UniProtKB/Swiss-Prot annotation:
The lineage of its organism: Eukaryota, Metazoa, Spiralia, Lophotrochozoa, Mollusca. One of its GO terms (biological process) is glutathione metabolic process. This is S-crystallin 3. GO terms for molecular function: glutathione transferase activity; structural constituent of eye lens. InterPro entries: Glutathione-S-Trfase_C-like, Glutathione-S-Trfase_C_sf, Glutathione_S-Trfase_N, GST_C, GST_superfamily, S-crystallin, Thioredoxin-like_sf.
Amino acid sequence: MPSYTLHYFNHRGRAEICRMLFAAAGVQYNDRRVDCSEWTGMRNQMPCSMMPMLEIDNRHQIPQSMAIARYLAREFGFHGRNNLDMARVDFISDCFYDILDDYLRMYHDKDGRMMFQRSYDNGSSSERRMRFQETCRRILPFMERTLEMRNGGNQFFMGDQMTMADLMCYCALENPLTDDTSMLSSYPKLQALRNRVMSHMRMSPYLKSRSSTEF
């Protein structure tokens, strides 16, 4: 088994899908949580000067959260059984990532840096919130219908197999649901899916024991 180190801030943010995949697979890894005060000094050492970044066997570096997530999903069996399945998992995951990305961008400063503070006002928060809300209106009904296409939406996006797509549904909506607990009231299948992820035999202990962070 390779050795893995995941580099990211002490927040869920864009790295949580990767942490959830490690948890779902039961694979050990070094969860390196970088303090914001460390980041300036190490930024230029990172590919694309960004995190998250996955390091494999202290030799290979993979930047970009969704590239990391897809790699882990393939390695651990959470990316579908064939190319068509994988394409389905990918488009569902990307749809939820659009929601996550638009949400987090409401808390970016003018230079594009994530502030990790709910109280932060970047001066364009109203415009960015409107964009986030429009993204949700565009994507959530489609995701509800997509889920219903397999077994009436009563299992997972790929039927009886939990994949990265289900984990993305959970983590992308965590913060938005904190802001608006009724967000999924019109999408009962998605709400039930999140509950299934939360009660999964490996996800439940992880979600209960992980660090509590604002984002």
